[in-house]
Regions:
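Hydrophobic alpha-helical segments
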Residues: 5, 14, 53, 89-90, ...
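A generic hydrophobic-segment detector
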Residues: 115-160
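Extracellular loop and loop/strand-boundary signature of outer-membrane beta-barrel proteins
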Residues: 28-29, 60-63, 106-111, 140-142
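Bacterial N-terminal signal peptides
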Residues: 2-10
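Glycine-centered flexibility sites
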Residues: 26, 30, 41, 93-95, ...
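Gram-negative (and chloroplast) outer-membrane scaffold detector with strong preference
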Residues: 45-107, 116, 127-133, 157-160
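Short glycine/proline- and aromatic-enriched beta-strand/turn motifs that initiate or cap beta-hairpins
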Residues: 13-61, 159
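Residues that define the transmembrane beta-barrel architecture of outer-membrane proteins
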Residues: 21-23, 36-40, 68-72, 86, ...
Length: 160
């Protein structure tokens, strides 16, 4: 009996795993812990091999403490499906961030922009809500010289 249950779960996971290799376009919202900023962005899942996908994304970090940011990421996910409609994934990739800060000095507003490249590392959890919708939560750490940053985000994607 145990063997039949195991085979059923394995085949359900295999059938659903094919659904993980579809393109997806979505929106996300997140929080950057070190700078206490809220983010919003768009992402795309582009599969290139079984359970592998490239994930480009663009995020805007809203101003907090007179600091805002644009971020472009290129990550790779390896999906590990389980229980039919769920998967976990490690992620790794690159980041480009452009931070802008404003300050007032002698009644003049000064602004400073810093552009940095970095490396992303993290993990995520994804759930297929329906045939065309998925939901994910993801945590990553961005290694950038003098500006390392922890980030958590949630996203909703449309699969096509």
């Amino acid at each position: 009996i145990g063997l039949f249950i195991f085979m059923g779960l394995l085949s359900a996971t295999t059938v659903r795993a094919q659904n993980y290799n579809t393109k997806c376009l979505g929106i996300s919202a997140g929080y950057m812990f070190d700078t206490e900023n809220v983010q919003a962005g768009v992402f795309m899942h582009l599969p290139f091999a079984k359970n592998w996908r490239v994930v480009p994304s663009v995020n805007y970090t809203f101003s907090h403490h007179d600091l805002n940011e644009w971020e472009i990421n290129g990550n790779i996910h390896y999906l590990i499906p389980f229980a039919g409609r769920f998967s976990v994934y490690p992620l790794a990739g690159i980041a480009f961030q452009s931070w802008r800060g404003n300050a007032l000095q002698n009644d003049k507003e000064l602004s400073n922009t810093r552009n940095k490249f970095g490396i992303n590392a993290g993990a995520g959890f994804e759930m297929n809500i329906s045939r065309h919708l998925n939901l994910h939560i993801e945590g990553k750490y961005i290694f950038i010289n003098d500006f390392n940053q922890a980030n958590i985000s949630i996203g909703l994607g449309y699969k096509f």
